[in-house]
Amino acid sequence: IGAGCGSFTKNYYRSEIKNIVLTEKDQLNLKNLHNKFKKNLNIKISDLSIDKIDDKFDTILYLHVLEHIKEDIKELENAKEKLNNDGHLVIMVPAHQKIYGNLDKAVGHFRRYEKDFFKDNLLDLKLINLKYLDSMGYILYFLNKIFFRNETFPSKFKIFLWDKIFTPISTIVDFITNYKFGKCIVAVYKKR
């Protein structure tokens, strides 16, 4: 859901997956998705919302999408209805409302999330995994909010530093700290 430019799909695509449906509302992204995956016969691209799609799925992914949807609970209820029995719902969202700031507003986030939101009985789905990711990102995002309060988008230099230096460090720190804090929350559910 919310495939964006398709980078996740491109990086993790496997031809043995029989049916992949990418949904995207942004018309430019939709056009780019059609161009990028036109040779992949097992990928369907749609501008429909999850409740309008006829298929049922083994897995539904919301990777940095739910925070852009005003009625997030309703969206998840619709997704649950589209899951096959024993299907998985995977959600990745920005964590910690206390660090919500100008960057969040600028990119259309309605909110950031707390772990409590992803309680075990969310929509009567079984919680399989719940953890934070990107520990260094949390620290840097928090510092950025304090020292660059009015900044809406990070500079190219900050993005470079993040991608090349802090992301690899964050991966190690996440593991060492057993995913106890971070800039993002990942929740994995199974339909009972």
Descriptions of predicted regions:
Residues 1-101, 119, 187-190:
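Conserved SAM-binding loop
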Residues 38-41, 107-110, 145-149:
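Short, hinge-like loop/turn segments at secondary-structure boundaries
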Residues 102-117, 132-133:
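Acceptor-substrate binding/catalytic loop of class I
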Residues 126-136:
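Conserved S-adenosyl-L-methionine
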